[in-house]
């Protein structure tokens, strides 16, 4: 065993780290099981706690909490027809139909077991792909990074909404926020309006806490729908028949896991898009498509495999290039910067033990998901009875304290509250917030690499296409923008 792997094992299996993982797992299971509290919110609420942790326990808390929250979102979807997380929404109707047929334990068991399988598959791809990509990325110059960031932002626009114009507006808003302050190549204050607090820019963490947590609190406050009732039927053995399902649907498991990992690696996509795509593909290629929507477990098997594999997939661009694959890894990148672990290829060469520790954390999180998920299913009815009108004030308190604790200033609390209101208004009007988040995270990197490239090339735009990898990334970026327009135009000319 190499010294780096030995250090990674020592870091991960430290007793303190094990306790952190268990506590974060229980927290993630609880948050995911409560309708409306998403895995992203679980991550955002953990950020203030990670201030007081070493890097590996901080990452351990986030990895385990998000993995558990993605799974436990299946529970209210199955028992109440109200998904706990967006990733569970794809197959909520299927799971609820199975519950009404007395097969709730099969639906929940499939979600649990195959989420863990998908998570392990995604982790294997992360372990195999990330070092190779990192070695390749060491050869990148500012030209390649500029196009790579632009490609990531482009994917975020087109993957998170069926209306790209709204995604583009959201992205522009995020890029505008990223421009605030002195942190730019010119060192000139931008959009500060004479406010000293804004010279350092808008804090990423208060902004994300506001956009993900405060927006949900506002949504709950204005929600007038009556609470849904739980299907009160006893749950049997959730593991019964799982081996039979694995033997019956091996292609679906592999396809869902592979698709989830691939979609997760696309910036801005995430587990929810992976689950929806996987469910649609499962129905399209099923031998029994007419059974979908009536309580057919096949779609749950494939989508469940996809949603957790997407989590590991999202870490590939985050660790290798510093480009978040989803909203969760956008928050993670902020945490890594706080811990002086700048994501990118240099992290693989300078601190390989930390990278290996991340691999181990993903493996452990998906393994302990089985027993902890089983326990969560058993106590799920008690969790779902927790009154949300008591829970939301507690969450609000955590948000305020966490935002204030970053710099001990009320300005960050104001940023959090304003961001929450803006995110709520955006989502209520059909604007996705993921492009805005990626704009905030990647705006500085985009500008820095653009300015650096312009200086290198003495102002020549042709240099952006001169290197083979840069030209390839440029072609991909332009194709994502213009191919849909070209296809639409050709269809119009053909009269289709």
Model-derived features: positions:
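Helix-loop-helix hairpins and the membrane-proximal interhelical loops
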Residues: 1-56, 131, 138, 191-296, ...
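Transmembrane alpha-helix interface/packing and boundary motifs in multi-pass membrane proteins
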Residues: 25-39, 68-81, 156-161, 258-267, ...
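Short helix-coil transition sites and intra-membrane helix breaks within transmembrane domains
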Residues: 30-41, 78-89, 121-125, 263-273, ...
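Re-entrant/interfacial helical elements at transmembrane boundaries that shape
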Residues: 39-49, 77-97, 128, 171-172, ...
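Membrane-interface alpha-helices at helix entry/exit sites of multi-pass transporters
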Residues: 56-60, 97-114, 287-299, 328-330, ...
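A structural-propensity feature for long, helix-poor, extended segments
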Residues: 66-77, 84-85, 296-321, 325, ...
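Membrane-embedded alpha-helical segments of transport systems
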Residues: 67-72, 113-125, 133, 177, ...
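Membrane-embedded alpha-helical modules
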Residues: 109-224, 338-491
